[in-house]
């Protein structure tokens, strides 16, 4: 069985510039999620041993295209157990993340994992994203949460539009998305994750970006 350090090489072969603090945080994710997943199931039991490939690296595909400055405000819509926001918060320690989910026990896992590995830049909120009215964000992110039409309906009103900035929605999706994109009424940019990470798992997985 591979050690956590060996599994982490899957991440570091694509991202070589992590600080020692970030590497410690990434290494700690496996133990933290295994401990909490045994109490509150946020990652399928058969998937937990593939945490770094299926969840951490998948989440970090957003980091491969994002150039976020210090102070950028990001909302994770339907964050579940913390993907993509937890790996992204490690990658961007000076970016502020709001992790939103309608299921409180999932946010309990996010809070616990953040405390265990020392993530300071995620705030959780037990609510539905459509009920957030008085706060604006630079970006919304999500992974396998809802159809693109709904995601943009929720995200569009709370995204700041800035000149010469690609502010908007970035979501991770898989499979044949042509009908979903057609029904969304928006014109997103669609990128193959397999073009970024040459792992078989990503062959039919995509980054969908909608600019405000």
Segments (PLM) and residue ranges:
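Class I SAM-dependent transferase core
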Residues: 1-70, 75, 105-120
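Conserved SAM/SAH cofactor-binding pocket of Class I
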Residues: 60-142
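A generic alpha-to-beta junction signature in SAM-dependent methyltransferases
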Residues: 66, 159-163
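Conserved beta-strand segments of alpha/beta enzyme cores
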Residues: 96, 121-123, 168, 189-192
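Short amphipathic alpha-helical segments
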Residues: 111, 152-156, 182-183
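A short SAM/SAH-binding and catalytic strip from SAM-dependent methyltransferases
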Residues: 139-152, 156-157
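Conserved beta-strand signature within the Rossmann-like core of class I S-adenosyl-L-methionine
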Residues: 163-176
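Active-site capping/gating segments
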Residues: 176-212
């Amino acid at each position: 069985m591979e050690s956590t350090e060996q599994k982490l090489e899957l991440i570091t072969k694509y991202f070589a510039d992590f600080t020692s603090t970030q590497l410690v945080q990434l290494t700690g994710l496996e133990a933290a999620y295994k401990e909490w997943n045994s109490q509150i199931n946020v990652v399928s039991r058969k998937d937990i041993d593939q945490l770094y490939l299926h969840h951490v690296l998948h989440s970090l595909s957003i980091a491969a295209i994002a150039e976020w400055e210090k102070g950028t405000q990001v909302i994770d819509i339907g964050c579940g157990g913390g993907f993509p926001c937890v790996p992204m918060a490690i990658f961007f320690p000076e970016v502020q993340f709001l992790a939103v989910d309608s299921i409180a026990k999932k946010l309990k896992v996010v809070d616990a994992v953040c405390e265990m590995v020392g993530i300071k830049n995620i705030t959780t909120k037990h609510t539905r994203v459509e009920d957030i009215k008085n706060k604006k964000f630079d970006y919304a992110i999500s992974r396998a949460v809802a159809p693109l039409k709904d995601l943009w309906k929720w995200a569009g009103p709370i995204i700041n539009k800035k000149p010469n900035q690609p502010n908007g929605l970035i979501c991770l999706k898989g499979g044949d998305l042509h009908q979903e994109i057609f029904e969304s009424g928006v014109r997103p940019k669609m990128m193959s994750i397999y073009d970024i990470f040459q792992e078989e798992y990503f062959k039919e997985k995509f980054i969908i970006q909608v600019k405000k």
